[in-house]
């Protein structure tokens, strides 16, 4: 009983999804199913009448009258066939429309769930396996369950009708046919479970094969692939994985096919026994020729409908197993969430931001990226974080914007732990340009507007943000200005240099007009002078706002009110530029080393 509950639960979920995607289409599908289920029985009955009428006409003297009746019955039979064909075409049209609607809705559900997931999930390969399986199954499994339910309903109605007819011949006939067909169902059940278990085991291999395919065909690795002649190596690895997957699947399918052939061979024996019994009764005058034809056709139809009925049950079982992959993904819960009663972030900040003895390590690792750091950022203050790669600078920004929560310690805004603040409100108050900023293959206008989608894309604000970031000159050179698609993925797109992409990302940050703005190595592709000019301009534009600057070039952070030097996840020095230089510590040594290259 407990095993059947997930099956019913999953089918119920898929049914609700299908209904929400189009109630009218669902009702129309059910009506068509009922109509198509009744027509075969009507066709059989008309066939019996035609045969009996022909038999009677052969013995009668009034051939014309008999032919007139036969013609009328043939006309009715033709109408039944025509209606069946029309209903079949209409059913196909409705099924296609509903399938498209369901697919769109499922993608919406997947996208919504993906947006909820924390960055922590992206540190775990199991998450990628779960996501991959959900993406594979989600577009069509609910629709297959719908089609399976409709097929089950249609075959059930047809079976009841044909079964009722066969009962008039002998009460044991329906059960006799069922016994012969059941072994096929058991084989389908068994191998559906085997296929499902295998498909879960193959996921890592399949993802790895897709990864090698993306390396070969995508633009990210294109230069190195050609420069180092790596194409054949990755293509061979792709082929090896694909061959393994194909051989494993073929082995499983071959075993299933062999088992089905054996069971199907046994399944046809009851039908031929019944054919012999029908012929025997007809020869002994216990049935008319019309009865023989009708019951002969009825046995054939019953076997066909029974196979369809049991096949629908097997398909529902298999699709239910694979639908569990989708529901497994949808069952994931974000860990960065609002409290029951989240608080609003103060506008504007009063006392500022305080970091209390914060430590953090990434999931699956015991190495602390941040180790007991404490600092205070006053409202409107401009600070800088400097240090070698891997010292924890970017991680600090992720904690500040609650992309992760600290392993220990707390971060407060005006004395309130940010975990108690509204997550949406907190992130609206912070604008970040990460070192690995996004490149959206959209228009230049959209690229900048995405920094503040709470408002319509006003031209004056977009242009102002572009000017502040220095992106306006690059955009002015484009074929269609702000309406030019950036990147080469789509038609008429134009590629930017790395430095120009960085300026567009900066414009996106300025567009947000947030009270707290963070620049995480946003100018790494600019030369030292361009970076200095940008930071100087930024320092002026950010007056009255809290700013956090992260840069590997110490000459560009000299204007910061306070500078914090991180090393191995700890703050080892802090102060103004002049104070740190005068102390002769790590900062002074690094500053002097860099200064030698610009003298």
Stretch-by-stretch model annotation:
Residues 26-90, 162-195, 269-276, 280-296:
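Transmembrane helix-loop-helix hairpins at lipid-water interfaces of multipass membrane proteins
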Residues 346-599:
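ABC-type nucleotide-binding domain
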Residues 1-12, 96-143, 205-248, 320-333, ...:
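Extended non-transmembrane interhelical loops and adjacent amphipathic helices
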Residues 1-40, 58-73, 91-95, 112, ...:
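Membrane-integrated ABC transporters
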Residues 44-51, 107-111, 124, 128, ...:
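Alpha-helical transmembrane segments of polytopic integral membrane proteins
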Residues 20, 135-145, 197, 201-204, ...:
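An intracellular "coupling" helix at the cytosolic face of ABC transporter transmembrane type-1 domains
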Residues 230, 254, 273-274, 293-331:
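Cytosolic ends of transmembrane helices, especially the final helix of ABC transmembrane type-1 domains
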């Amino acid at each position: 009983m407990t095993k059947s509950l997930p099956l019913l639960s999953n089918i119920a979920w898929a049914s609700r999804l299908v209904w929400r995607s189009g109630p009218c289409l669902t009702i129309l599908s059910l009506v068509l199913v009922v109509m198509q289920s009744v027509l075969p029985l009507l066709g059989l009955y008309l066939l019996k009448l035609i045969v009996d009428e022909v038999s009677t006409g052969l013995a009668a003297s009034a051939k014309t009258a008999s032919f007139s009746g036969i013609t009328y019955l043939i006309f009715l039979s033709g109408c039944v066939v025509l209606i069946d064909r029309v209903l079949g075409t209409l059913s196909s049209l409705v099924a296609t429309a509903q399938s498209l609607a369901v697919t769109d809705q499922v993608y919406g559900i997947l996208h919504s769930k993906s947006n909820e997931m924390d960055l922590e999930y992206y540190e775990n390969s199991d998450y990628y396996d779960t996501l991959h399986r959900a993406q594979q199954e989600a577009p069509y499994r609910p629709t297959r369950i719908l089609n399976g339910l409709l097929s089950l309903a249609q075959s059930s109605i047809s079976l009841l009708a044909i079964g009722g007819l066969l009962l008039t011949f002998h009460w044991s006939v329906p059960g006799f046919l069922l016994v012969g067909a059941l072994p096929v169902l058991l084989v389908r059940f068994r191998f559906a479970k085997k296929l499902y278990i295998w498909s879960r085991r193959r996921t890592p291999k399949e993802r790895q094969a897709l990864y090698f395919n993306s390396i070969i065909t995508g633009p990210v690795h294109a230069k190195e692939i050609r420069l180092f002649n790596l194409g054949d190596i990755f293509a061979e690895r792709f082929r090896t994985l694909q061959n393994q997957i194909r051989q494993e699947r073929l082995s499983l399918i071959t075993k299933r096919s062999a088992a089905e052939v054996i069971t199907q061979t046994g399944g046809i024996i009851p039908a031929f026994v019944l054919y012999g019994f029908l012929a025997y009764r007809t020869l002994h005058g216990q049935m008319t020729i019309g009865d023989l034809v009708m019951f002969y056709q009825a046995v054939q139809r019953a076997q066909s409908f029974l196979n369809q009925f049991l096949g629908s049950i097997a398909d529902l079982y298999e699709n239910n197993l694979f639908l569990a992959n989708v529901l497994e993904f949808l069952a994931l819960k974000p860990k960065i969430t609002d409290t029951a009663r989240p608080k609003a972030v103060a506008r504007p900040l009063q006392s500022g931001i305080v970091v209390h003895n914060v430590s953090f390590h990434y999931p699956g690792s015991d190495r602390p990226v941040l180790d007991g750091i404490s600092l205070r950022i006053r409202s409107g203050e401009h600070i800088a974080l400097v240090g070698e790669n891997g010292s924890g600078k970017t991680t600090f920004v992720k904690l500040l914007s609650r992309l992760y929560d600290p392993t220990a310690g707390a971060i407060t805004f005006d004395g309130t732990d940010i975990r108690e603040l509204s997550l949406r409100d907190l992130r609206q108050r912070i604008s970040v340009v990460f070192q690995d900023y996004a490149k959206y293959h959209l228009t230049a206008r959209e690229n900048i507007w995405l920094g503040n989608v709470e408002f319509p894309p006003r031209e004056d604000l977009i242009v102002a943000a572009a000017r502040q970031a220095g992106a306006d000159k690059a955009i002015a050179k484009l074929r269609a200005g702000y309406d030019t698609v950036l990147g080469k993925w789509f038609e008429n797109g134009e590629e930017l240099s790395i430095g120009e992409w960085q300026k567009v990302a900066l414009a996106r940050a300025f567009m947000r007009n947030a009270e707290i703005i963070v620049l995480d190595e946003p100018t790494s592709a600019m030369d030292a002078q361009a970076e200095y000019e940008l930071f100087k301009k930024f320092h002026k534009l950010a007056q009255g706002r809290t700013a956090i600057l992260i840069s590997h070039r110490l000459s560009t952070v000299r204007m910061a009110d306070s500078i914090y030097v991180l090393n191995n996840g700890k703050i080892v020095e802090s102060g103004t530029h002049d104070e740190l230089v005068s102390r002769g510590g790590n900062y002074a040594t690094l500053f002097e080393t860099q200064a030698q290259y610009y003298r």
